[in-house]
Amino acid sequence: MKHIHNVKLRNTLIAWCFMAPAMAILLVFVFYPIVYSIPLAFTDYSVFGETAFTGLTNFKRLIADPDFWLAVKNSCVFVLMVPILQVLSIALALLVNRKLRGTAVFRVLIYLPVVTSMVAVAIIWKFIFDPNGLVNGLLMEWGWIEAPIRFLSSRALALPTMMAITIWQGLGYYMMIYLSALQHFPEELIEASVLDGASGWQTFWKVLIPLLQPQIWFCSMVSTIAALGIFDVVFTITNGTGGPDKSTYVINFYSYFQAFNKFDFGYSAAIGIVLALITLVFNLALNVYQKKGGDVYD
């Protein structure tokens, strides 16, 4: 018994040693800033002068700030990519789940953007969507357009283009989650539905989608949090301006902009708290909707 206890203790210590670096990073760069930002939001913080307590002044400013509401609107628009991302991810998972030649290579290629820095991805796509870049070159070569389209300097196209880039990078991650689930489904269920005369669409909609429900909810929550917290693609492609003409302002970027361009750290902290509340509301709504839908295994 003593030997077993020592082995368990040793394994526990080893586990804590492996987790310690990640936990230290989380404590220093995530949890401490979150805790510090809460009282900061109620002050007029000054780097060089005195910091004054201002109560709810920063939150009152938010209500009257048109740029903040523009950022909220754009962040909510970004959330619209969540269902598109899930549909494409499920479609790709079904495609690569087939036992066809070359699917292993295809999986790697689809997953590759996930492990690539978003900053690097954004820089590459910035060149691709340039007026003299690959996309415009192909569209003009095929005769679909006569003049280059300014994807990233157009108020109407800049945000949708960034959404497309974000979808492209996230596809591989969600595809692998759905693929893992598909590969663990009992084949007897699929075979039984076929024997009962179900078409391919009926099998997909009546059998596979209910079985994928836990993964769909998980991926929807994760991608919603990611969409509301989007920052790097906006910052990189717009060179830290949120342009053209503020059209790509999102909440996370606007919080950064107030802190490091305007040096208004108290107001930035207030924006961050509101972002956290909006994210919480979205995910609570998803949870409520999921519970109303019931458990597919009931």
Regions found by a protein language model. Name each.
Residues 1-5:
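N-terminal leader/signal peptides at the extreme start of proteins
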Residues 7-298:
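A structural signal for multi-pass alpha-helical bundles of membrane permease subunits
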